[in-house]
Amino acid sequence: MYIFKLMGQNLTASQSFPYNIGPIVTGYVGKSIWTLHSGTKKEDGSAVSIFSFDIKKNPSKLEVAKNGFKRAKTTRHPNVLKYLDGLETETNIYIVTEPIQLLDELLEDIRNFENAISWGLYQEGLSFLNNKCNLTHGNIQSSSIFVNKGGDWQIGGLDFVSDVKDINNSILRNHNDLIPNKYKSPEIMKSQWQQIQQSPSYSIDSWMLGCLMYECYNGTMTKAEDIKNLDQIPKQLHQAYQKSFAVKTESRLNPQKFLESPYFQNVFVETLVFLENITLKDTFEKEQFFKKLDQHIEKIPINICKFKILPHLVTAFDLGPVNPRLLSTLLKIGSNLSTEEYNSRIVPSVVKWFACDDRALRINLLENLEHYIQHLNEATINDQIFPHVVNGFNDNPTLKELTIKSMLLFAPKLQEKTMIILLKYFAALQKDQQAGVRCNTTICLGRITEYMNEATKKRVLIPAFSTALKDPFVPSQNAAIQAFMFTISNYSLEELATRVIPEVSRMLISPEKSIRTSAFTAINMFLQKIEKNVDSILPSSPQQQQQNGSTLNTNPNDPNQNSQDSMLGWAVGITKKLYSGENSPITATNNNNNTNTPPINQNNNNGYKSPPINQNNNQNNNQNNNQNNNQNNNQNNKSLQNKQPTKVIHDGWGDNDYQEPPKKQTTTNTPSKSSKYKVEDNDDDDDDDEDYQEEDYSKYKEDLPRLTPKPSSTSSSSSSTSNKLDNKPMSLVSKNKPKYSFDEEDTSSSSSNIVNKNNNNKNNNSDGWGDDDGWGNDEIQVPSTTTSNIKKTVEKKTIVTASKSDGWDDGWD
């Protein structure tokens, strides 16, 4: 029955112990009568350290263990190991403390920080025991000193704490054999207990404190004689060190006096002592302290910064105004916290700081964002921080730029709806008065593209970068070109050909060489992508298929037929796009190879040569054909003029108010052998010379051909693309009758635009991002004629349209 009763008691005790005992700390084995375990609290899983004593295995040491258990529960001081809980059973004694580490295992790392050892030796706890409690510790050594998570040295091993003057107290007298001899004072070694009773309570501890000083700078003592070696001991410590080993017990170092030693007069100790008493300091003292703290923070171990300095800094910011520059120090320290610790200790304060009106504090928050952004989760950023951050877009220029730059770090964690809000702010910032703000907005927009969804990219990127191209600020133009290049993977081939390249090509004639260079580089990149991928996405055109079919019906063994077919195919393709008055080499070739023209027989049956073909008749026929074509075109153009465009095109980023000035350029038309309407740019002044040529040109001004590339194997692809583009209704050049006059030496370049200036401000009702199709409402700008003779004909009502068979190009022959 006794056995079952004992088992029941042990089971009840085990169930009532609210801690999980973990593995043994091997570094502590053999250094104490206690066994040290790591453990956790059952309720919340928080870490603890547990000392256990096995009564059955060490019955002779039970008195010492019970004394240590009692002193641990009753001694409270910041420098004494913090007692959390304990349990005594029939078989074991448990002491639960805060999580700790062994000083022996940390000394190597502590020595790397100047004056860090001095903070450990600044032992107010020992002075408290000796002078306030009149107790002797009796076991001061490196194995009885522990380090908590805040880097503070804690006094443990309270097994021999007693009043040595009490005759009835026999703990130290009866069990001093458990203390290594190298740490014992001479009077203990000689068992001079009567002398000990007459000595100050600190006499034994002072000797052991000197031994601890030695081990901190030299390592573990091997014998008592090692204390005579002062080579590694700092000079500021020599006097106190030597006094600890005084022969007379009353002359030994008092721990209270030791705290006043010059050895502790350093920044490390002064900083930590001030923080421990910061609640007693006035505002001026706090301000002076915080100014100096940033200069010395790197000299303090990280654990001390995290758990001792950081809490005081957070409290200082929450309670009152402090130097905002100190925020960088706080955030650097906080970056070493885990995500859970950061969310509980820093994030609530960060949210509060972003909401404040102190510009200096908000600037520092943005400047140091990289130190804490990784600890902020998406919900916190989108719901609590972002609504306050965007207020910086409406603040002074400094805050605007910092807020824009901060979006590079915020963007990966923004939700879709938050990203849309951000892009609306960016649309407004592209029209900001500050040039630097506009430029940085474009750069930032290009770099956060990867965090947008596909629909947003299609709707925003091209209008946004096109707006930046029109910015008179050169860096903004360059930023837009670079952004187009950086985001090339987000554009389809059709978008590159019809929207991106036309916008960037305007920069080819920029007055700034750097812009021209960037534009050439960008366009080459776009063209390479189109050339590489266009054949894989466009089907063959019906013309190409018909041409392939006609090739199959020909006789491959007839070289003359092949030659004629190839030449006729070229001629037919050109005549569909060109008018008869141009490209004389082609016309001549057609006349020579036309199968309908009777051959010239040089030797006939009558013995005389047949007359040559009348070239004048051919020219007259060509003239009549041109006139008929002109009449038909005029009728078609008039019908188109009466039609209203089905859709007004406008980009959502503002009107196209940027127009390059016309460049001086001389163009020469190639003379035609088959047409009598030869247009030559020889009229360089305002006189009436060569008026017949100007009149002819004015009469047939609408017959000017558009430069068409030579047909090749890819003609079918290009024609297919042009058909797709031609389906979009073209806007009229002008609804009124604008009159333009050009100086004779101001010939229009291929990139100049003839657009009614009164329409520049129309349709400026964008919501910031354009219509759903991504184009907006800008009118399409058509290329103008490029001859100086236009000054007599431009006053006429002119409608420029693109037929399905004609391709747009960049100049004139």
Swiss-Prot record:
Q: Name one Pfam family in it.
A: Pkinase
The residue ranges of the Protein kinase domain are 1-264
In this chain the HEAT repeats are located at 340-378, 380-416, 417-454, 456-493, 494-532
The UniProt keyword set, sorted, is:
Repeat
- Residues covered by region (Disordered): 539-566, 583-790
Q: Which InterPro entries match?
A: ARM-like, ARM-type_fold, CIK-Related_Protein, Kinase-like_dom_sf, Prot_kinase_dom
UniProt feature, compositional bias: Polar residues: 548-566, 664-674
Query: What is the protein name stated in its UniProt record?
Result: Probable inactive serine/threonine-protein kinase scy1
Gene for this protein?
scy1
